[in-house]
Regions:
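Lipolytic serine-hydrolase domain surface
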Residues: 64, 73, 155-216
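Serine-dependent carboxylesterase/thioesterase catalytic core
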Residues: 79, 86, 99-181
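Active-site catalytic motif of lipid deacylating hydrolases and related acyltransferases
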Residues: 35-112
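Solvent-exposed, acidic/flexible segments
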Residues: 64-72, 91, 95, 119-126, ...
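Bacterial N-terminal signal peptides
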Residues: 19-29
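Bacterial N-terminal signal peptides that target proteins for export
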Residues: 3-21
Length: 216
């Protein structure tokens, strides 16, 4: 059954006015995001509460998606409704801010599981955070890049930190994924619309599987 969900550095800047108009025009094309797939809700809901509470998921909005057309906040809300109460959404962030948040979480509980989910250009903030954490021997458990082209040049020019256990690269069907990310797997979503990827049913399905894996 499908469920409707609520809807620096190469370096990041706010989009010019024409880009904002383009985002508005593409809102309809992005469509209505639904959650579906083969992982039953019971796979999440039967996990012990303490296992889900140990997982902290930070969803980071694209700096270009100022209108939140990608609906990543709705994805975070969906996972909170499924018991992953420590799912947070950042409208804006930075590498140092994310690194500081990871350190704070580790300080509170060194057994916590941390996932960073970056929509499009937010991948550069995750890269920056990992680089900073790597300098002090710190790491995260999972990173997810959602259809990011921004990260491709960064990785081609500077490589990618490896201080994480697993990377999931979720890309639309006509967009080649970034290459050179260690410990990574590629997941495709059957859309050619960049703005639809973050809340696409296949994306949410993959995130469900990854969070269950992380909590177990």
């Amino acid at each position: 059954m499908k469920k409707t969900i609520p809807s620096e550095s190469n370096r990041l800047a706010y989009p010019p006015i024409p880009v904002l108009f383009l985002l508005v025009l593409l809102t309809v094309a992005a469509g209505c995001a639904t959650v579906g797939g083969s992982t039953p809700d019971s796979d999440i809901e039967t996990l012990p509460v303490e296992s889900k509470d140990r997982v902290h998921v930070i969803f980071i909005n694209s700096p270009l998606d100022v209108l939140q057309i990608g609906r990543l906040a709705g994805v975070a809300s969906y996972f909170r409704s499924k018991g992953f109460q420590n799912s947070s959404f950042h409208y804006l962030s930075s590498g140092p801010k994310l690194a500081g948040e990871v350190r704070d979480l580790r300080r509170e509980d060194d057994g916590t599981r941390i996932a960073l989910v970056a929509w499009s250009g937010a991948s550069l903030w995750v890269w920056d955070a990992l680089k900073e954490l790597d300098e002090t021997g710190e790491r995260v458990d999972l990173i997810v890049y959602l259809d990011s082209n921004w990260i491709k040049k960064r990785v081609a020019d500077e490589g990618h930190p490896d201080n994480f256990d697993r990377a999931v690269l979720i890309y639309r069907s006509d967009n080649p994924p970034v290459e050179g990310v260690p410990n990574s797997v590629i997941r495709r979503v059957e859309t050619t619309n960049h703005l639809a990827v973050a809340a696409y049913p296949d994306t949410v399905q993959t995130l469900s599987e990854e969070l269950v894996r992380l909590a177990e």
